[in-house]
Swiss-Prot record:
EC number: 3.4.24.-
Protein topology in the membrane: Multi-pass membrane protein
Lineage of the organism: Bacteria, Bacillati, Actinomycetota, Actinomycetes, Micrococcales
Protein name as it appears in the record: Protease HtpX homolog
Transmembrane segments annotated in the record for this chain: 10-30, 34-54, 153-173, 182-202
Catalytic residues identified in the record: E139
Organism of provenance: Arthrobacter sp. (strain FB24)
Signal peptide range in chain numbering: none
One Pfam family here: Peptidase_M48
């Protein structure tokens, strides 16, 4: 459903991310005169990716202390999700609410048959039903475009690269016969940096696509634009604490859940909010009067 250019861009970024992982293994293997680290890097990457893929929903929901809600508890939420799921001819996801006052939402799960959508109590209080429908359209398109799989794989591979880089910095390559210690240390510093930049770029690309596809599903891009404006303001007033579990989940959320700081655009998991709003307004033919 999503933009063909963005699909190619995501595939290319994934290729570079895996190349960084294997390159890290190659540098270690070359310096230690062994190819074993290359295979270890590949196997760890595959194993971590598989774990992240199968458990992405549990990990994300647990990090936000989310609880399932019934249709009796949240009838309007169910009504919107059921309508949009039927319109997309897709199964109904499980619905959760997180008890945080910070306004946000995310979707998780390895495929549409095992998906969950979570809204915070803060976003349910903040948005109108029209705006909430725009947000849920965005989140459902993350599921239908398999973005949860994409982001989980990217996060897992980047996490492996970062962990290996940290170990190399601590142990210094480990082998006194190391023929090229400078190359190992340089890779230990640069590979995690590159991995985070690539993972962030993948995440930003998927956000743009979910905005576009979600607005096509709801037929109301201005509703999402209005919701994003409110969410951005709300997050600045009630940000999430920078807990590591929340940091690991933040790329799934519709907006960066932390207070704006000095992070450059290269490392941001979400596009600039004004860019997203402007794109949505262009989809609608201009801002609301």
């Amino acid at each position: 459903m999503h933009n063909h250019h963005n699909g190619l861009k995501t595939a290319a970024l994934f290729g570079v991310l895996w190349a960084v992982l294997l390159g890290l293994g190659a540098v270690i293997g070359s310096s230690m005169r062994s190819t074993t680290p290359i295979w270890i890097m590949a196997l760890v990457g595959v194993g971590t990716t598989a774990y992240g893929y199968w458990n992405s929903d549990k990990l994300a929901l647990r990090s936000m202390q989310a609880y399932p809600v019934t249709e009796e508890q949240a009838p309007q939420l169910y009504q919107i999700v059921r309508e949009l799921s039927a319109k997309a001819n897709q199964p109904m996801p499980r619905i959760y609410v997180s008890p945080t006052p910070a306004p946000n939402a995310f979707a998780t799960g390895r495929n549409p048959q095992n998906a969950a959508v979570c809204c915070t109590e803060g976003i349910l209080r903040l948005l109108s039903l029209r705006e909430l429908r725009g947000v849920l359209g965005h989140e459902l398109m993350h599921v239908y475009n398999r973005d949860i799989l994409t982001s989980s794989v990217a996060a897992a591979v980047a996490g492996v690269i970062t962990s290996v880089g940290q170990m190399l910095l601590i142990f210094g390559g480990g082998d006194r016969r190391n023929s090229n210690p400078l190359a190992v240390m340089a890779m230990a510093l640069l590979a995690p940096l590159a991995a985070v930049v690539i993972q962030s770029a993948i995440s930003r690309t998927r956000e743009y696509d979910a905005d576009e596809d979600g607005s096509a599903l709801t037929g109301d891009p201005l509703a999402l634009a209005s919701a994003l404006r409110k969410i951005h303001q709300g997050v600045q007033m009630v940000p999430l604490p920078p807990d590591q579990k929340l940091v690991n989940t933040s790329h799934l959320m519709i907006a960066n859940p932390f207070r704006a700081g000095g992070v450059t655009r290269m490392f941001a998991t979400h596009p600039p909010m004004q860019d997203r709003i402007t794109r949505l307004e262009l989809m609608a033919g201009g801002p609301a009067s």
